[in-house]
């Protein structure tokens, strides 16, 4: 299916996105924006303002929520692009949002690796439990990852082989749709795959294997059952999030780089990008497990909504009864 904007014009780039993709992207990003904004604003407020005793996990969660919000705030521009069928915000802003597509999972995976290492310390090395309260080291680790990721993302703003040219009619921003355009700089991309996917992935796998071995062989008998249960829930949540959201994205990324030179719409690239973006909402499970304050906030919001519904029902019923009594009085 083609649109007026996707019809070929001599000498001009073609917008390769089907109408079905644009509709799906609009619906998907609208849901992600609404849910993700509420969840992560609440989480950032809870972890930064209401948590009295901060630990290393609290620091990591604050960074996860902040990273999610940075990414979520770019979604309205994507939605407007798909709705209008053209890019009205200029070439450089398009490059920034395209770079953000790779910037987000790079930091997210390292933060998940930090949380995994934290749970390793809590379960396997409880004698170093004091280190879990050393928030200064956690802050330094997070700052280091942000700086390292920014440094390796800046070259994406300087692409010399750009699918979106200034003469495109209508203006396009193919870079935010999927990751196929990144094949122009494969040397940097393979380096990014190693440092921002494989290394944090191996850290997580190593931590999980040692934790499982310790649990199976009874080497964690000194730990409280609640600590074990909480750590196991965190580990399961992290594993599911990595397997569902980040693994397909990076596998597709690698195959696209090893593929041919054709720079066209790739449904798998777009689909795995959707899955990666879904992580901004799935973090709510992690927040809920880690923080009792976040649990209380979510429960209070749900109770307040139930209260409003009950008030509306009562007002509706009372209004109906009043109208019936008025009708009866008029008939009499």
Swiss-Prot record:
Residues exposed to the Cytoplasmic side: 48-56, 117-138, 214-233, 291-332
Alphabetized UniProt keyword annotations: Cell membrane, Cytoplasmic vesicle, Disulfide bond, G-protein coupled receptor, Glycoprotein, Membrane, Phosphoprotein, Receptor, Transducer, Transmembrane, Transmembrane helix
Gene3D superfamilies: Rhodopsin 7-helix transmembrane proteins
Bridged cysteine pairs (disulfide): 94-173
Primary localization class, coarse: membrane
Pfam families with a match to the protein in the record: 7tm_1 (PF00001)
PROSITE patterns on file: G_PROTEIN_RECEP_F1_1, G_PROTEIN_RECEP_F1_2
Residue positions with a glycan: 189
GO annotation, cellular component aspect: cytoplasmic vesicle membrane; plasma membrane
Coiled-coil ranges from the UniProt annotation: none
GO terms of molecular function: G protein-coupled receptor activity
Extracellular face residues: 1-26, 78-95, 160-192, 255-269
Localisation per UniProt entry: Cell membrane; Cytoplasmic vesicle membrane
Record-linked InterPro entries: GPCR_Rhodpsn, GPCR_Rhodpsn_7TM
A biological process term (GO) from this entry: negative regulation of leukocyte chemotaxis
Transmembrane segments: 27-47, 57-77, 96-116, 139-159, 193-213, 234-254, 270-290
Phosphoserine modifications at: 323
Membrane topology: Multi-pass membrane protein
Family statement drawn from the similarity comment of this UniProt entry: Belongs to the G-protein coupled receptor 1 family.
Task performed by this protein: G protein-coupled receptor (GPCR) that plays a role in diverse physiological processes particularly within the immune and nervous systems. Becomes active when triggered by various endogenous ligands including endocannabinoid N-arachidonyl glycine (NAGly), delta-9-tetrahydrocannabinol or resolvin D2/RvD2 derived from the omega-3 fatty acid docosahexaenoic acid (DHA). Upon RvD2 binding, facilitates the resolution of inflammation, aiding in tissue repair and homeostasis.
Name recorded for this polypeptide: N-arachidonyl glycine receptor
Annotated source species: Bos taurus (Bovine)
